[in-house]
């Protein structure tokens, strides 16, 4: 949280912050979205969901990226989604068919080039739309 607050005030910044994380980092992206109202977008990739009672604190728009075949992480999605809906949080779920945990990591046999490209494109679009200043 301290690092995020430091980045918010960096010279030349626009006062907006986006977070992206993979695996454990995805869980951290979810966590930061519940703790920092200054987070504009968050893109957690196959990260564990935050506590449902904290979801109402989310002000960010989310791109939740899940692999199709990850039982533990995916089991937390239905209650997370219900909490997102109840809180009115704007989110998109991307769960490419046939993917495994870590599908975005090109150093593993689980890498899925098409799914990784789709997920990254949607992440960039979200960040451009929510972080760039008008003008």
Question: Regions from the language model: what does each represent?
Answer:
Residues 68-74, 101:
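Acidic catalytic loop of the alpha/beta-hydrolase fold
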Residues 74-83:
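Short alpha-helix in the alpha/beta-hydrolase fold that links the catalytic acid
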Residues 58, 64-66, 96:
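Short beta-strand/loop motif that positions the catalytic acidic residue
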Residues 85, 90-135:
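C-terminal catalytic histidine-bearing segment of alpha/beta-hydrolase fold enzymes
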Residues 40, 57-62, 87-90:
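Short, proline-enriched alpha-helix->beta-strand connector loops that line the catalytic pocket
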Residues 1-20, 130-134:
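Gly/Ser-rich "nucleophile elbow"/oxyanion-hole loop immediately N-terminal to the catalytic nucleophile
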Residues 21-25, 29:
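Gly/Ala-rich beta-loop-alpha elbow adjacent to hydrolase catalytic centers
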Residues 38-48:
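A conserved short beta-strand
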């Amino acid at each position: 949280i301290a690092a995020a607050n430091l980045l918010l005030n960096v010279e030349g910044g626009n006062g907006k912050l986006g977070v992206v994380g993979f695996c454990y980092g995805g869980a951290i992206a979810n966590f930061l979205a519940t703790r920092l109202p200054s987070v504009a977008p968050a893109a957690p990739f196959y990260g564990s969901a935050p506590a449902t009672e904290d979801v109402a604190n989310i002000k960010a728009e989310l791109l939740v990226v899940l692999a199709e075949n990850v039982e533990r992480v995916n089991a937390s999605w239905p209650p997370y989604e219900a909490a997102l809906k109840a809180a009115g949080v704007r989110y998109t779920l991307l769960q490419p068919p046939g993917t495994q945990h870590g599908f975005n990591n090109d150093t593993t046999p689980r890498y899925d080039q098409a799914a990784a490209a789709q997920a990254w494109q949607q992440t960039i679009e979200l960040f451009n739309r929510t972080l760039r200043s008008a003008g």
